[in-house]
Each structure stands twice: as C-alpha cells, then as structure tokens.
C-alpha cells in the first residue's frame, strides 16, 4: 500500500511504502525552512537538489548534494534549509 503524506501546507510531500518488511518514503521539498521530528532512526538520501541540515547536537549546518546521505537518530529532530526543490529517499532504520 502507498501512503500519501503532506506537510508544511503542502510544501513537503511524500509517498510511503513497505518493501520486504522495510518502511521507506520518497518525496519532494519545495524551498523553505523546516523542522522534522523522528520516531525511529532515519537515513535520508538526496536524489536531486540539496539539503542543508542541522541535527540536534550539531553546532554547524551541513550540506548534502544529490547522491549523498545522512542519518538522524530516533526520538530527535533536525532542521532543514531547502534552497531549490529537492527530491529525497527516507529509509526508516
């Protein structure tokens, strides 16, 4: 089954799915600043575009380009700065 999600007044949209018992989602973020909370640990891979992120405990912002990935701890949050429309894959670890 595919689960549709919309966040931040429709500026972030994703499609969630399960493959061989593993949950993932693919989506697009329009330019803007966002804060996401996590329940489970996540790995985010930038498919096209770029994400500038700051996780809880980080002192500086980090930029991830297409093909690069970062992980976020469960039960935490992270801030995103999106300058161009960006596609991503989120894997729930």
Swiss-Prot record:
<dbReference type="GO" id="GO:0047975">
    <property type="term" value="F:guanosine phosphorylase activity"/>
</dbReference>
<dbReference type="InterPro" id="IPR011051">
    <property type="entry name" value="RmlC_Cupin_sf"/>
</dbReference>
<dbReference type="GO" id="GO:0004731">
    <property type="term" value="F:purine-nucleoside phosphorylase activity"/>
</dbReference>
<keyword id="KW-0328">Glycosyltransferase</keyword>
<dbReference type="InterPro" id="IPR009664">
    <property type="entry name" value="Ppnp"/>
</dbReference>
<protein>
    <recommendedName>
        <fullName>Pyrimidine/purine nucleoside phosphorylase</fullName>
        <ecNumber>2.4.2.1</ecNumber>
        <ecNumber>2.4.2.2</ecNumber>
    </recommendedName>
</protein>
<dbReference type="Pfam" id="PF06865">
    <property type="entry name" value="Ppnp"/>
</dbReference>
<dbReference type="InterPro" id="IPR014710">
    <property type="entry name" value="RmlC-like_jellyroll"/>
</dbReference>
<comment type="function">
    <text>Catalyzes the phosphorolysis of diverse nucleosides, yielding D-ribose 1-phosphate and the respective free bases. Can use uridine, adenosine, guanosine, cytidine, thymidine, inosine and xanthosine as substrates. Also catalyzes the reverse reactions.</text>
</comment>
<dbReference type="GO" id="GO:0004850">
    <property type="term" value="F:uridine phosphorylase activity"/>
</dbReference>
<dbReference type="GO" id="GO:0009032">
    <property type="term" value="F:thymidine phosphorylase activity"/>
</dbReference>
<comment type="similarity">
    <text>Belongs to the nucleoside phosphorylase PpnP family.</text>
</comment>
<dbReference type="GO" id="GO:0005829">
    <property type="term" value="C:cytosol"/>
</dbReference>
<keyword id="KW-0808">Transferase</keyword>
């Amino acid at each position: 089954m595919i689960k549709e999600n919309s966040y931040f007044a429709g500026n972030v949209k994703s499609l969630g799915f399960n493959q061989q018992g593993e949950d993932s989602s693919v989506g697009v973020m329009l330019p803007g600043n966002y804060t996401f909370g996590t329940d489970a640990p996540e790995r985010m891979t930038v498919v096209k575009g770029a994400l500038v992120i700051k996780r809880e405990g980080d002192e500086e912002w980090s930029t991830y380009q297409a093909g690069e990935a970062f992980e976020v701890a469960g039960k935490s949050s992270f801030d995103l700065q999106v300058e161009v429309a960006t596609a991503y894959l989120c894997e729930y670890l």
